[in-house]
């Protein structure tokens, strides 16, 4: 796929650089656009998972998106019984293909770090 925006990037930027950049944009979008979203039920969780997936797939060069939200419901059942999405509740995998490079990036809560870590899971480059 031709990229009409490529001319705005430095000529030093490789396909690998752009694939990694685009993967970071996708994860940043998920974290900064959707954290704070109110959730009350498992149905809300499923709808939000699908919304995040569709939003990220709408961005350029996305091949695949997987979203899982970890949700613990409070047993009170009252009118104020809801929670809001946090980055640590998301398990997100995004696959981006730009030029000759494919990147799988992940956002996942790492208990050892007590942090929702965004990281590169895999990089593949096609040999020409």
Predicted regions and their residues:
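Short beta-strand/helix segments in adaptor/scaffold domains that form protein-protein interfaces
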Residues: 1-128
């Amino acid at each position: 796929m031709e990229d009409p925006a490529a001319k705005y990037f430095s000529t030093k930027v490789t396909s690998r650089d752009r694939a990694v950049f685009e993967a970071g944009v996708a994860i940043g979008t998920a974290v900064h656009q959707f954290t704070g979203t109110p959730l009350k039920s498992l149905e809300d969780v499923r709808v939000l998972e699908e919304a995040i997936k569709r939003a990220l797939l709408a961005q350029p060069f996305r091949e695949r998106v997987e979203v899982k939200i970890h949700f613990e419901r409070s047993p009170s059942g009252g009118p104020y019984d809801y929670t809001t999405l946090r980055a640590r509740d998301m398990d997100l995998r995004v696959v981006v293909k730009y030029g000759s490079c494919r990147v799988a990036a992940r956002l996942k809560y790492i208990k050892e770090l007590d942090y929702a870590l965004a990281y590169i899971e895999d990089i593949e480059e096609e040999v020409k």
